[in-house]
């Protein structure tokens, strides 16, 4: 079973985060204490691509697990993010560009004159919600939590419904001129060193049951495969299946009685010899 995928909706004018981190504790509903230790750990989701349409990545996963080369080229063609250019009035105007907006990296620290804003980067927090628009439970929406507020970003479908409602009521649209993109984060088997900036933290209390069960099933399958390849594990199983594995090392009753009589006879001979000496 493949690991779940996270999707984050953000404004095109904002920079994406390079990775999302999730730290899970032990699940009290797990059957075995050994399995609970397997489920606990830190998970790393790496930014793989940025899309303009939210249904492109999901469509590829519904059709086949491995996209073709043509699909990959089409995906990269959608990852072109529009850049901002100011007009005479100082108002940012969205214009198409061939340059892709990239998150700051460690190499950018030496090239930028003012790194104070980057070094003071505070890790944004995300909460995970189910994605009811897909048939599979692999893709989940990660909603960014606003700093200083308890409300979350609206769901992509809920956002479109609100915009449609406001447009029918002839009300002004506050975000009608803003473009949005979708960042796709895939789980990585190898967790690198946590960067000092440009990463997000997932709230462990907001993990849906389907998301957590997907992680747990993947860990269980990996644990079973590793146990099968372990020769020591096979040797222990073979010994435990043997009848003599559970037998104690105590002597039989007849052997114990014979040894006791021999010891008593030897003790009496020694005592008699000491008496005559």
UniProtKB/Swiss-Prot annotation:
Q: Name one GO cellular component term.
A: nucleus
Listed Acidic residues bias regions: 251-277
> Which keywords does UniProt give here?
Cytoplasm, Nucleus, Protein transport, Transport
Chief location of this protein within or outside the cell: cytoplasm
One GO BP annotation is:
protein import into nucleus
Please give the InterPro entries that the UniProt record associates with this protein: Iwr1, TF_Iwr1_dom
Summarize the protein's role: Directs RNA polymerase II nuclear import.
Q: Which family does it belong to?
A: Belongs to the IWR1/SLC7A6OS family.
Subunit description: Associates with RNA polymerase II.
Q: What is this protein called?
A: RNA polymerase II nuclear localization protein iwr1
| Naturally occurring in which organism (per UniProt) | Schizosaccharomyces pombe (strain 972 / ATCC 24843)
What gene makes this protein?
iwr1
């Amino acid at each position: 079973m493949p690991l779940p995928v996270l999707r984050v909706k953000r404004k095109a004018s904002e920079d994406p985060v390079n990775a999302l981190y999730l730290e899970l504790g032990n699940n009290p509903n797990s059957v075995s204490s050994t399995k609970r230790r397997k489920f606990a750990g830190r998970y790393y989701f790496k930014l793989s691509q940025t899309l303009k349409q939210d249904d492109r990545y999901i469509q590829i996963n519904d059709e086949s697990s491995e996209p073709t080369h043509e699909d990959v080229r089409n995906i990269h063609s959608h990852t072109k993010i529009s850049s901002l250019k100011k007009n005479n009035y100082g108002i940012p105007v969205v214009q198409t560009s061939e340059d892709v907006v990239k998150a700051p990296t460690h190499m950018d620290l030496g090239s930028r004159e003012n790194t104070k804003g980057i070094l003071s980067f505070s890790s944004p927090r995300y909460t995970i919600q189910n994605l009811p628009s897909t048939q599979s439970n692999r893709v989940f929406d990660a909603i960014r939590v606003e700093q200083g507020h308890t409300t979350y970003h609206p769901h992509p479908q809920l956002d479109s419904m609100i915009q449609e409602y406001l447009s029918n009521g002839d009300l002004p649209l506050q975000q009608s001129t803003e473009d949005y993109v979708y960042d796709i984060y895939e789980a990585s088997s190898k967790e690198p060193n946590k960067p000092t900036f440009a990463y997000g933290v997932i709230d462990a209390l907001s993990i849906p049951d389907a998301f957590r069960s997907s992680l747990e099933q993947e860990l269980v399958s990996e644990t079973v495969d590793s146990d099968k390849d372990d020769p020591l594990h096979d040797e222990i199983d073979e010994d435990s299946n043997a009848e003599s594995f559970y037998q104690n090392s105590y002597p039989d009753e007849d052997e114990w009685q014979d040894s006791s009589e021999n010891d008593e006879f030897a003790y009496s001979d020694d005592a008699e010899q000491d008496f005559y000496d």
